[in-house]
Amino acid sequence: MKTGSPVSQQELNQMGSAKIFLIEKDGVQVIEKRNPTQIEVAFYQRYAELFNVLGIHVPRLIQFDDQKNVLHIEYVPHVVDQAFLLEDDRVIEQLVKLHQLPPTSDGIYHRHQWTPQATQQALTTLELGSETEQFFHNLQQRSAHLFDGHNLISGDSNAGNWGQRENGELVLFDWERFSTGHVAIDLAPLIEGMGTFDDYLKVAGRYIKCAEKGETTELARDIGIAKAWIVVEVVNILVSRKNPQTSKYLDWFRQTLPQWAKSLSAQVMS
C-alpha cells in the first residue's frame, strides 16, 4: 500500500471534519488524520494511554505533527456491526467506566448543545408534519439536563466508531466529539435506527445494572430525547458539509420520524 493512499475515503471519513487515510508507517498500518480538531488531538495526548490502562480501549497515539497538523493513531482492523453493540457486554462496561471518570478543569471538550434554532433548521430541511415538528420542539425544551452533566462522554458511540484489535479487545475511536454530558448521549446510538421505548428500557436496564445507580424509566426517557437530538445534529451536519449521502438519510428520516414520534410521545412526554 502506498503511503497516503485513501482507503474507502467515504467510509473512513464518515461525517467527521478531518481527512482520514489508512497508511503504512515503518512497516505498520496506521490511521492518519489530517487537520484533526484540537479536541481530538488533546484527547489522544492526555487520555489515550490512561484510558487503555483503565480498560477503556481507544486507539493508541503514535505521533502528532503539530507543524503539519497531522495525527497518527493505531489502526483497529476489525469492524463490528450494529447488533454487536447490544450483544457484547463489554460495550456497556466500557461506557460505564468512561462515564465514571470526572472531567478536568483544563480539559478540552466539544460543546454539545441543542438550541431552538438548530431544531428549526433541521425541521425546515426535513419538512415533517406539524405534530412531529411540535414533538421535536417539545423535546428540545426538555433537553437542557442532557448537556449539564458532569460525566465524561464519547459523544459519538455509533457502531461505525467501534472496532476490535487482533487480540479481540474492543476499541472505541473517533473522539472529536469527546465531551461532558448525560450518559444517554452515549447510549442512544447503541440502538439501531430510532428504536422503540421498549428498546430504550432494555438498554437503560442493562446500563443501570452495570453502573449500579440510576432509574430505568427515567434513563429510557432521556435516551429518547437524545435520539431526537441526534437527528437534529445529523441532519444539520449532513446539509452543512454537503455529504453525498444526505438525500438517503433525509428520505429515511421522513419515512420513519412521524410514526416514531407518535409512538413515543406518551412515554417520553409523561
Label each residue range with its predicted role.
Residues 184-215, 227-259:
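Active-site activation/catalytic loop segments of kinase-like enzymes and analogous catalytic loops
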Residues 28-71, 81-100:
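A conserved alpha-helical element in kinase catalytic cores
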Residues 78-113, 129-136:
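Conserved kinase catalytic-core helix
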Residues 1-5, 253-270:
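Regulatory N- and C-terminal appendages and interdomain linkers associated
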Residues 89, 171, 188-191:
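Glycine-rich, phosphate-binding/catalytic loops in enzymes
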Residues 67-84, 120, 228-247:
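A glycine-centered beta->alpha junction motif in the catalytic cores
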Residues 2-25:
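ATP-binding glycine-rich phosphate-binding loop
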